[in-house]
Amino acid sequence: GLAEVTIENGRLLLNGAYVKMRGVNRHDHDDHRGRAVDMERVRRDLELMKLHNINAVRTSHYPNDPRFYEMCDEIGLMVLAETDLETHGFENVGDIARITDDPAWEPAYIDRIERLVLQERNHACVVLWSLGNESGFGRNIRAMYGRCKELDPRPVHYEEDRDAECVDVISTMYSRVSQMNDFGEHPHAKPRILCEYGHAMGNGPGGLAEYQRVIDRWDSIQGQFVWEWCDHGLAATAEDGREYHTYGGDHGDYPNSSSFCIDGLVLPWQEPSPGLAEYKQVLCPVAVFWMDGLLHVRNGRFFTDTSDVVLDLERVVDGVTDSVRLLAPGTLVPGQQTVLPCPVEAAAGALTHLTVHVRSTTATAWAPQGHELGVYQFVVADESGPDA
């Protein structure tokens, strides 16, 4: 395909249309082979993203195999294409920008961005270039930006250009919900993204719905990327033959980061976690609200209508589904809303819910016909009594 990425009046446009990136940060990882990742596994990663309403991926923090970008072109994932630059370790001596602001290192910095752009600039999936990650700011970042723009006109991102001196898209990581709302209330002249947030460690990412409400509220905030896609556990075999997964320190390695890399939306063997299920629901592209016998439906997509969408309605009485019907929302263009009659009779002496499954009626390269985009549930009436 062909893509044109522009910025007009502080808004990022893809082929002339406003868009928000609903993304994740992805590292190459295989629980049996480490960084040696075959393309079948890469394909599975990307299909899982699409199945969970994710439309963008950041190649944190290095270029990927060229076939990765071909797959993103094919299945429709936007890419924040990042070069392999990080000087995070210099924080240990109090100067993260030590070589970033050293002219002796300029050729090496330029070489990094040249290799990325020259290799991937013919891919329509690339929406933003990224100059690297956590390397401070200085003269070599300015030089990288200039060379990047010479090679390709697409917008450039770099989170540690905090004042957006040269980058085209301003970015932060791990900003609080209240900070994001402040950013929206007082927008920068350039579009804004949240390149890392929702650190998916332990019990999972927190506050995703709260973040999404703020991100959806403000047009100047045009994307977010959860940290991160996959747990970096490595498979091992116990004495009894069972497989288990290890992390830092389990192999006698020292120093190590302990479990700090067990922070993904999918488990090491590519099984979705509950956190990914939550993110999918938060990103559901067709929003549904029910009140007083009416379904309010909004098309939150950016490019396609809802002619392929059906609502699968269930009345649930005391936890048991007792009736099912289908309802088509009609052809809503992006951003359009409608109200549909949906009377639901409350069951006497029981707790009655309305469950709405949002499904696609068409098969795609990554999903079968009938794929569920999201599910909503509403309390119709609670007549179960105080002892229920």
Residue ranges and their predicted role:
Residues 309-311, 316-351, 355-368:
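Intrinsically disordered, low-complexity Pro/Gly/Ser/Thr-rich segments with frequent PxxP/GP/PP motifs
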Residues 1, 6, 296, 328-331, ...:
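Generic structural detector for well-ordered beta-strands
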Residues 129, 345-348, 384-387:
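Polar low-complexity intrinsically disordered regions
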Residues 1-2, 16, 363-387:
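Short beta-strand elements
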Residues 301, 355, 360, 383-388:
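Beta-strand-rich N-terminal accessory domains
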Residues 292, 322, 384-387:
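Flexible inter-domain linker/hinge segments
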